[in-house]
Amino acid sequence: MSDRPEADRVTGTPHPRDCPRLIGHAAAEAEILASFDEGRLHHAWLLTGPQGIGKATLAWRLARFLIATPPQDGSSLFGEPVPLTSLDIPDDHPVARRMIAGAEPGLCSITRPFDEKAKRLKAQITVEELRRLSGFFGLSAADGGRRVVIIDSADEMNASAANALLKMLEEPPRNAILLLISHQPARLLPTIRSRCRTLRLGTLGPADMATAVTAAGGQVDPASAAALSELAQGSVGAALRLLSQDGLGIYAELVALLATSPQLDRQRALALANSCAGRQNEARLDLVLQLLDVALARLARAGALGRAPEVQAAAGESTMISRLAPNAQSGRDWAARAQVIGDRAR
């Protein structure tokens, strides 16, 4: 594969095509299989839920399954239905091998393209990317099989691309299955949403989170697994980012800094700011701001609810929150501060 950044891949983690195992979403797979077994698989699926929870992994698993599995005629040698119970396809299956190599003719993946002049990914999926599908669907599917399209993410389409997709959904090609990944489905045209079958994936609990992170190549300290799950909010992608950029350490430092309020330890704050200075530390600055927003949101929520979160995301967090957000008014104050800081950071 190329060293170029991929729009559908979290930096430092395996691409979804390289993750044949899906963790924590058995119910979603069961819903798809039930539809498949009953012979009423919808031609377009909208996979929704927070970013990084496994939607793309499910899409690639489903694509692998659909291309590798011949259309069912609804009967076996003895005439009874033959229900399938898993989307698993062996790693040595020709389709699995071709997908890993990026050479499966029955699959087309649509993502934000790479801008050769700017040497970075474009900000949107353009109509030119959708036009590629005309040629893709114009080819005959091998052995009369299916053709699968993955759009990751559909939220990133510009208006022209969205309209081109809508026309395709209104008149779907024969044996075509479209898999749309969406982190924010409200951003999609209502007419696109209405022509898809929506399947929402939930966030992962601590145990599934640790298993999924380990499967993706990360290492989770059992002592910090609960804190990692709390900060990642059930997203494997977010958890991997936190692990690769010392997110737990950064959050612990933010908690310690907030604990010095209202005076605030200015030397400590300056040291944290200096650690984010320079273009080489842009990723760290982005994470610090994101985690500060999380900390302020937890303060605001605790004030509104009248109690600290059940799970501490850092040592001393419960004590800090109980002192700084003891009531509903303090919760509203922290929410207002979060809004001001967020506006200034943009």
Question: For the regions a protein language model found, what residue spans apply to each?
Answer:
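A short hydrophobic beta-strand->loop->alpha-helix junction that borders the nucleotide-binding pocket
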Residues: T48, S109-F114
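Conserved Walker B
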Residues: S153-M157, L169, P185
